[in-house]
Amino acid sequence: DRSIKNPEVFVKTNVLGTAVMLNCAKAAWELPDGTFKADKKFLHVSTDEVYGSLEDDGSYFYETTPYAPHSPYSASKASSDMLVKAYIDTYKFPANITNCSNNYGPYQFPEKLIPLIINNALQGKKLPVYGDGKNVRDWLYVEDHCKAIDMVCNGGKIGEVYNVGGHNERPNIFIVKTIIAQLHDRLKDDGISEDLIKHVADRLGHDRRYGIDPTKIKNDLGWYPETPFEKGIVLTIDWYLDHEEWMEHITSGNYQKYYEEMYKNK
């Protein structure tokens, strides 16, 4: 959402920022003969959004899927991926790229769907859902993602790209209704119900479906997502219920201004 309102910030951060990081790493790690220190590797963490959108036909994103970004954010990430690939090809720079699906879990900033819905429901606020709510995302629990990153850092072949997916495809409206049901059952609060759901105008450039095939990282490194969504969402809700003070702190000030601006006409 932020990239739609202010794309320049994302270009500066994701494109120019990646270029700065690459240049700094190259300067620090390059040896006089043009090779690089053997114990160094640059890991570029990217997104499945660079691949565009999938139809609801059982297809998946693979490492060989052509890039087709649809938003300023995904275009900036695609550009940064290409920069890393260019350094690998041009300088034999020691790097890997990972493209992951939607993360969720503890400490996620509340502009993201799952913490946003949890926070709003606890406060009795409306739960904004874009369009018909049937956009599908592949949900990856954050600890599973961290394990994948560790495996790629320590075992990934230089120059390779690895897709990291959760095998947990769910429509957004399913996510929202699941959170409502979980909170209602735990808190015995009749105010937390599906009546809070408010469908709002669809987001510009909103991709319909994402789905990653993680076969390559499974075969090469032995990684596979361990956390089914039904378990991960319980762990996530537990964490936010146990850390309401953190949520109150993080949603004050600048975030509150952003939230009000984003949804003021919806």
Residue map of PLM features:
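A general lysine-centric signal
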Residues: 41, 77, 112, 216-218
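Residues that scaffold the ATP/ADP-binding catalytic core of kinase and kinase-like folds
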Residues: 53-54, 106-107, 220
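A glycine/serine/threonine-rich, flexible loop-to-helix segment
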Residues: 57, 110-118
